[in-house]
Amino acid sequence: AAKLVPAIRFVTSDTGIAAAKVSAMLEGTQHPIHIGSCIAVDHRHQSKVEDFEAALDQLFAQFGDSVARLQKLLDIHLSYPVNAMTRICKKLSLPKKAALEAIGMFEMAYGGGTATAHDVFMAMQEIPYILKSDHAPEGKMLVVEENMARALTLRWGDYDLAKAVSY
């Protein structure tokens, strides 16, 4: 297993949305794992360093929360992990082609047994890697990463159903 280390990403835009965004992630896999939502600091009205400090305080609180949620996924055992992954990808409106590719890779790797929600969440991290490999625009990548981070807040047992699901 890869050793994951905390990281922070700052994103600014000089067109459209006049805000800087800061988000928490874990690095150590082929593509960083986005955990938690982006926190925006409006910079239209000459934001000060203090505004960014407040955003970072909020980010660090959220980061601790998200890491705890990620750890809890280790305790959630899924009887039908492929079905759960498919339902969760669909619920999060993840790009179908990349999601189906990641689901197929997970299905081949795990071989039809049970898995933890953590295993499925980590398998879902192939999706941004696939999109990046296909040269998806940065804006789309940010939306997908934020949507994927929402998986940490879902009730995984609700998606662990025997009935097959189509995407």
Regions found by a protein language model. Name each.
Residues K3-Y167:
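Intrinsically disordered, low-complexity regions enriched in serine/threonine
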